[in-house]
Design a protein with these regions (language model features):
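Non-catalytic signal-transmission and effector/linker regions of two-component phosphorelay proteins
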Residues: 1-12, 18, 25, 49, ...
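Two-component signal transduction core modules
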Residues: 58, 106-107
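Active-site residues of response regulator receiver
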Residues: 61-62
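Two-component/phosphorelay signaling modules centered on CheY-like receiver
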Residues: 18-37
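Acidic catalytic/metal-coordinating carboxylates
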Residues: 40, 68-73
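Acidic, metal-coordinating helix/loop segments flanking the phosphotransfer/catalytic sites
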Residues: 37-57, 97
Length: 136
């Protein structure tokens, strides 16, 4: 009997702009993470309830359609899955950043692809983002 292959960790991308979601997914496919795409915070939360134990990172836009935005999602994720790497992004976050829970990384748009890949690699390896928070 062969050994079971270890299940790859997952990253969830939450972005309502289909082109930007596709671009982010294509970029993160360079990491060793499987990608799950969602267009709303509600869809991401539903996904997390199903496969949250396999997810190591969520990358979410702040401004999303629906009842929840990316900050609301970050608060829910931080409460339910505190170990998870959570990144939010926006070109215009307004006053929503003041409501981010501790440990959530904010990356302003336009972000640098290399920064996303560095965060993904740290998440995949289970490393802290504290050093990145100081520089991003």
């Amino acid at each position: 009997m062969g050994q079971a292959r270890p299940q790859r960790r997952k990253a969830v991308i939450v972005e309502d702009d289909a082109d930007l979601r596709w671009l982010t997914a294509a970029l993160l496919e360079e990491s060793e993470l499987d990608i799950i795409e969602c267009e709303s915070a509600e869809a991401a939360l539903a996904t997390m309830l199903i496969c949250g134990k396999d997810v190591t990172m969520i990358f979410a836009d702040i401004r999303l359609p629906g009842v929840m935005d990316g900050v609301d999602l970050a608060c829910e994720v931080r409460m339910r899955w505190p170990h998870l790497t959570m990144i939010v992004t926006s070109g215009n976050p307004g006053d929503r950043l003041q409501h981010l829970p501790p440990g959530v990384l904010y990356m302003p748009k336009p972000w640098q692809p290399l920064n996303i890949l560095m965060v993904a690699e740290r998440a995949r390896l289970g490393q802290s983002l504290s050093a990145l928070n100081a520089t991003t």
